[in-house]
Amino acid sequence: MRDRGPAPIVTWVSDVGRIELSVITFNNAISKASNFLVDGLELEEDATVSVSLGNHWQSSVWFGVALATGLTIVENDPAITLGANAAAQTWQGSPDEFVVVSRDPFGMPDKEIPAGFVNGSAEVRNFGDFF
């Protein structure tokens, strides 16, 4: 993959536009998000996560994060759910078990999220570029 450099590896098309992520950009997103989950949230290898972002390029990033970190993706009873702000609004569990990931086409963090929840799209920006 590294030989592809700036060539697109992920293309996401929706009614709001088209986003292409190069190998470099995709790897950077995975690295930052991996560091966030491991160092920021202190998730350990084999922890369980649910990626509930639907048809969005962020889904491919977070699935890549699970592979890079050794996390296990599950549908039921995860340690952490990665989901959109709209899902956080109706979340019945503890806010500590839900990370809000923006569904903005360009990945801009949501400006307002429910109290007590982690704004994952904002937090990942504070973590290193290499995992």
Language model features: what each stretch is:
Residues M1-L21, R125, F131:
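AMP-dependent adenylate-forming
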Residues A7, E44-D46, P78, P95:
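A general structural motif
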Residues S14, T25-F26, V51, T81:
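Acidic, surface-exposed loops and disordered segments
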Residues R18, V23, N55-W57:
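Alpha-helical scaffold segments that form or flank carboxylate-/histidine-based iron centers
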Residues I30, N55, A84-N85:
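Helix N-cap/beta->alpha junction signal
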